[in-house]
Amino acid sequence: MIKWPWKVQESAHQTALPWQEALSIPLLTCLTEQEQSKLVALAERFLQQKRLVPLQGFELNSLRSCRIALLFCLPVLELGLEWLDGFHEILIYPAPFVVDDEWEDDIGLVHNQRIVQSGQSWQQGPIVLNWLDIQDSFDASGFNLIIHEVAHKLDTRNGDRASGVPFISLREVAGWEHDLHAAMNNIQEEIELVGENAASIDAYAASDPAECFAVLSEYFFSAPELFAPRFPSLWQRFCQFYQQDPLQRLHHANDTDSFSATNVH
């Protein structure tokens, strides 16, 4: 059994958090032991700095808290926890929730409607999530609610609103915008050809640049084999920004599994 270095109690009365069990979700199994250790260290600090607030009867236990923290910290594994500054609370509903939405049309009329949301992220406010979709974020399917909302937070570090361009050097902005819009157009063309439900990338990515960055961040971490070959130039930009290469990580994990299987006697 691995003796995890993070299992250090803050006091004699505190029970060690179940980090090893929390790491057992499919999304995190490709991480090396060194990466897992680094991720847990970030997640421990995350839980010290942020407040998880269960709503509408949702029950939050230590395992759920650990897994939520791990998913929040995965995108900033190499960037650093300071990239998640600017909010202090995560509100968690048991299921998708209803909100009042107000929007203005092209002629200036203001409309109000109630819509169902999976999550929300405010620039200087809390992140709102729901547990059903968090659970669906544990696998490697291309869907990850927490990474989506974290991407919006990373996006807004570059200005007053999410633009689809995170905080990168000015000389890289034009190339980023070009590749992101090319990806949006490609996704839209597929939608027009096969329909939203049959599209290989979530159709929400074609709605605007901010959502494209957030959706493709989900695929970057949880389905790199779909993202990388389809948008290779944009993939390299994501690798450079996040300072991670999930596809290389996946290939290494698969090679390790294959080697282990061939050496079983």
Swiss-Prot record:
Keywords: Aminopeptidase, Cytoplasm, Hydrolase, Metal-binding, Metalloprotease, Protease, Zinc. The keyword Hydrolase applies. One of its GO terms (molecular function) is zinc ion binding. Its cofactor is Zn(2+). Disulfide bonds: none annotated. It is an enzyme of class 3 (hydrolase). It is found in: Cytoplasm. The keyword Hydrolase applies. Zn(2+) binds at H111, H148, H152, E211. It comes from the Bacteria. Binds 1 zinc ion per subunit. Its EC number is 3.4.11.-. One of its GO terms (cellular component) is cytosol. GO terms for biological process: proteolysis. Pfam families: Peptidase_M90. Involved in the modulation of the activity of the glucose-phosphotransferase system (glucose-PTS). Interacts with the transcriptional repressor Mlc, preventing its interaction with DNA and leading to the modulation of expression of genes regulated by Mlc, including ptsG, which encodes the PTS system glucose-specific EIICB component. Shows zinc-dependent metallopeptidase activity. PANTHER family: MTFA PEPTIDASE (PTHR30164), PROTEIN MTFA (PTHR30164:SF2). Interacts with Mlc. Belongs to the MtfA family. This is Mlc titration factor A. It comes from Escherichia coli O7:K1 (strain IAI39 / ExPEC).
